Design a protein with these regions (language model features):
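Proteins enriched for Cys/Gly/acidic motifs involved in redox and nucleic-acid/cofactor modification
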Residues: 1-180
Length: 180
């Protein structure tokens, strides 16, 4: 990050967009904290950021369609700004068919990871900055719960507190056990 910032003569910027539940909002605070720790500066305008991250939701099909729509718009921005990085994470990335669709039809995306390995985010960013290929790191599940990640709180008066991760009831109508 430091080398690229020196080349550009300014700090690298990022913008995180959160789709979905309170756990995604909490995860986005962690993503923000990690990015700031490695030298990025938050940018309010998505189109101006060097790194755009979508923290996705997949509970409803409409949420998936929103992400695809936003990616179409972001592709046009990236064509004008080829050094821009695009990262996707969250529940939607835990679905194998979504990742296959992204690999095939959205090859301009730079980084894809799921809900179980946010603690590796800085490492994944470094891997992408060192290579010129799409980085995909999806874990089906994990027994690792890393709680001491840097976090940048969006509100001074409230905070998300994870009391559980996902659910293991596997109700026939629910996707949560498969993606969280």
């Amino acid at each position: 990050v430091k080398t690229q910032a020196e080349t550009l003569g300014r700090p690298l910027t990022f913008h995180v967009t959160t789709f979905g539940c309170q756990m995604n909002a909490r995860d986005s605070e962690k993503l923000t904290g990690i990015l700031e720790q490695i030298g990025y500066v938050e940018e309010e305008e998505e189109n101006q950021a060097d790194f755009v991250i979508y923290n996705t939701c997949t509970v409803r099909e409409n949420a998936n369609q929103k992400v695809y729509g936003h990616l179409g718009q972001l592709n046009r921005v990236k064509k004008k700004n080829p050094h821009m990085l695009i990262g996707l994470c969250g529940c939607m990335m835990q679905e194998p068919e979504v990742v296959e669709k992204l690999k095939k039809s959205y090859r301009f995306v730079d980084l894809i990871f799921g809900t179980h390995n946010i603690f590796k985010f800085a490492e994944l960013v470094a891997t992408r900055l060192e290579s010129d290929r799409m980085v995909i790191d999806i874990w089906k599940d994990t027994d690792k719960i890393v709680e001491d990640l840097p976090s940048e709180r969006k509100f001074s008066f409230k905070s998300g507190v994870n009391i559980m991760f996902g659910c293991n009831n596997f109700c026939s109508y629910c996707i949560v056990p498969y993606v969280r």
